[in-house]
Amino acid sequence: MCKIKLSSKQQEIASLKDGAILVRASAGSGKTRVLVERIKMLAGMTKRKVLAITFTNKACEEIRTRLAEVDENLLEHVFVATFHGLCESIIESHIAATRFVTMPQIFADDDRKKILEETITETPSLSQWYRGLNDKERRETLYRALDNISLIKRSVILDDELSKVIKDGQMRNLYLSYREQMDSLNAIDFDDLLLNAYQLLIHNPRIADLYRRSFTYICVDEAQDLNKAQYMVLRAITGSEHKNVMLVGDTKQSIYAFNGSSSKYMDDWFVNDYTPTIYNLNENYRSAKAILDYAQKVVHDDTLDVTLPYTGVCKEYAYDTPCEEAQEVVSGIKSLVGTEIEGYDGKLSYSDIAVLARNKFVLGKIEEQLKSSNLPYHYKTTGAGLEFASTAAKAFDLAMVVRTNPYDRLHLDMLQSIVGVSHCKSLEQVVESISDAFLKEVVQQASLLEDDGSNMYQTIKSVLNTLKASNASEFKSTDEALAVFDEFELLKHHWSSYAKSVTNYSLSAFRNAMSLGQTSVASLDVEGVTLSTVHTMKGQQAVVVFLVGMDEGTFPDYRAIKKGNNSIEMQQEKNNLYVAIT
C-alpha cells in the first residue's frame, strides 16, 4: 500500500502528541485523513488505548478500515465509536452502578410515542383533555411532548434541577411519569444513553477514572455537531486533568441544531475548558474552483484555498413548476451519462450522480421521472436500525426482543397483534396460542435463543429449513416466500457483523447494536442515481450533484424565514447549502 502524502500543515497536526488540540477544518480539507494519521501515530506509541469518537457508524467503519489497511494490530489500541455507542458500552459495562438490573432495551421513536400516549391516558389531569383531541391534534401533542422530553435530556437537566429549570409543572410530571413507564419496561431511548452515561460517570468517580486511565488520547471528529449532553459526557470522561483531547470540525458545516447541536461547544466551551492549540485547515482537495467560488458566496469565507487543477461547473436554473424541474434534471442526467468530464477518469455512470434536496418529499417528482424513464436510482439511507417487511421476520424480531427483555409488555402486545393472538402474559403463552404453523415455528425458535446468542446461526437455519419445507399455499406468492427468506438471510448477516465486532456475545447487546445501526452490513455500491436529503448525504460525495427544490419556503425552510435572516435557523439553512455544494 502506498504511503499517504500529507501537506506540511497536515503532517504537523498528525505528528502532535500531548496537549489539547482544536483543528478547524474546512470542507474537503482532508480532515479525516489527518485524524486517521494521528490516531495511527498515537496507537503505535501508547500501551493503552486511543478513543476515537465520531457521529455516524459509517464514519466509524471508515476509520477502522483505514487503520486496518495500515496495520490490523492498530485496532487493538483504538476504540472507535459514536457517542451513543460509547455511552451504551459504558452503561452495559457498569450496569450495577445504574438503576437497572440488566442492560435496558433501546426503544425507537415509534415505541416512545406509544409509551408517551399510554402515560398521558393514565394521567388523570391529562387523560380527558387528550381524549377530546382529534387525530391530528393528538399527533402534534405527542411530537411536542417528545421534543420537550428530549430537550430536557439533551440539556442535561438532572432531577434536582427540574423544578428550577422546567417551570411547567404538568410537563415536569409528564417527563417523570414517562421515565417511570420506560423503567417498568426496562427500556431507555437514545437520549437516555447520553444522560445515563453522564450520570454514571459523575456519580462514580472510580469508574470515570477507569476510562480516564484507559484512554490516553481522545479524538473527536465532526465536533461542530456536538450537543450539550455529548460535550458533558466528554468532560465527565476527561475530568479537569486529562488534556490529551483533539477536536476536529468546521463551524460552517454545523447543520443539526434541531438536535441541540451547536458549534459553540467546539469553538467556545472546549476552548475555555481545555485551552487547546488551534490549527486551521483551509486547503480544499475535493471541489473544483467553480464549486468553491459558489460556496464562498454562501458563507462569505475567503480563506478556502483551491488545490485542484480544473475549473469545474456550477450552474443555476429556474423552473416554473416542480414537474418541469424534475423533467429537466432527469433529461440532464441522461445527457451526462456516458460522457467524459474534466478531472474524472472514465465515462460518467448513473452511480456518479446524486440529486439532493432539503427534504425527502421534494424528491418525489424526481423519482417519478426516473421511474417513467426506466433509469436506475436508490435512496440514500442512514443505516440506523433495521425494519422488516414480512410478518415472519417482524414476529421473529419482536419475539427476540421479548426474549431478551421479559419486562417488555409493549413489544409482547405488538407480537400478539402480528401473529393474531391475545391475552398472553408471556412469550411461551404466545407460542402455545399461535395457530399458523410457520409463524408458530418462527416465534418458538426465537424463544429458544440463548442469552449469548450462540445458537443464532442454527436458529435462523432451522427457520429457513422450515420455510423451504413449508407448503407454498401458506404464502400469498412465491415473491412473499422469497422476501421472508431474504430478510432472515439479512438478519444472519447482521449477527455476523455484530459477532465480528465483539469478544463476548449477548443477545440483548446484539438487539441494541441493531437499534444503534452498528450492525449494518457494508453493501456493494448500488448502481443508480442517488436520491438523498442534504443531512443524510453529509460526508459523502458525488461527481455530479443536482440540488433541487431551491425555492423560498422549502430551501431555505419556511420556519427559518419566519425567524429572520439573523436567526440561528437561517444560519443553519446557509450551512445546509454550503454542505450540499461542497
Identify the meaning behind each predicted range.
Residues A81-S89, C219-E222, V248, N359-F361, ...:
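Conserved helicase core region in the C-terminal RecA-like lobe
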Residues T46-K49, V70-V78, H94-A108, I120-K136, ...:
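Short, polar/flexible loop-turn hinges at active-site or ligand-entry regions and domain interfaces
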Residues M1-F100, D209, D293-Q296, V579-T582:
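P-loop NTPase Walker
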Residues H77, A97-I188, F215, I278, ...:
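ATP-hydrolysis module of ASCE/P-loop NTPase motor domains
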Residues N272, G312, K347-D479:
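ATPase/helicase motor core of nucleic-acid motors
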Residues C2-R24, F79, F107-K113, I166-D268, ...:
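Conserved helicase NTPase motor core
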Residues A27-L35, T275-T277, N282-L375:
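Helicase P-loop NTPase motor core
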Residues E432-T536, D557, N565:
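Accessory C-terminal helicase-associated subdomains
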